[in-house]
Regions:
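C-terminal and inter-domain tail/linker signature
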Residues: 1-188
Length: 188
């Protein structure tokens, strides 16, 4: 049996385990809220995901490209996720190595892995000029350093996300085979 190189449905397990280990009820709720958010996002469930957020969430994506991205408010965040789900972008795995929780929120640190088809990479502007190996495989796996700050409000709802990428995901691409991804994964 081939070992899976990506398994998105394992992403929220470390958060649930950390919540089970601690006694502070507020921290337990915050950890489970982040886990609920992550699970809904990775499973493409918009309403449960948005229910974890405040009425006016704010997202910051740092070092996604040459331009950082900011999403302000319910409509922008909801639209972002709707577009992500339509394009299969929710199918990623967060491999969490460290979790920090306090009364103000949660911080997760680790890696984020995502599979891209050769055709999707080309639609994203990747060419043989920018990535000479693109035509060598139909499927590619990125594996990028990620820190996410999950601030919360006094009602223990998530205010949004501050997402810091340690590197450009396109610079970490490695070929992957179909038998190295879970059966539930949809290749778009």
């Amino acid at each position: 049996m081939t070992t899976l190189k990506i398994d998105p449905h394992k992403s929220w397990i470390p958060l649930r385990e950390k919540a089970d280990e601690i006694s502070n009820e507020k921290h337990k709720i915050l950890l489970n809220e982040v886990a609920n958010h992550m699970e809904a996002e990775i499973k493409g469930q918009l309403d449960p995901l948005m229910n974890t957020l405040t009425a006016e969430p704010v997202y910051h994506f740092w070092r996604v490209s040459d331009v950082n991205m900011i999403l302000n408010g319910y409509e922008e965040v909801s639209s972002f996720y709707s577009n992500m789900f339509q394009n299969g972008g929710e199918q990623f795995e967060v491999v969490t190595k460290r979790i920090i929780v306090n009364d103000d929120g949660v911080i997760t640190e680790g890696k984020v892995k995502q599979v891209y088809t050769k055709d999707n990479l080309k639609l994203m502007g990747v060419t043989t000029d920018t990535f000479s190996e693109i035509d060598n495989s139909n499927l590619w796996l990125s594996n990028t350093q990620l820190i996410t700050v999950w601030p919360s409000d006094p009602d223990l709802k998530l205010v949004g996300e501050d997402i810091y990428f340690g590197e450009n995901p396109m610079e970490t691409l490695k070929p992957i085979n179909e038998d190295e991804i879970p059966d539930y994964y949809k290749i778009n």
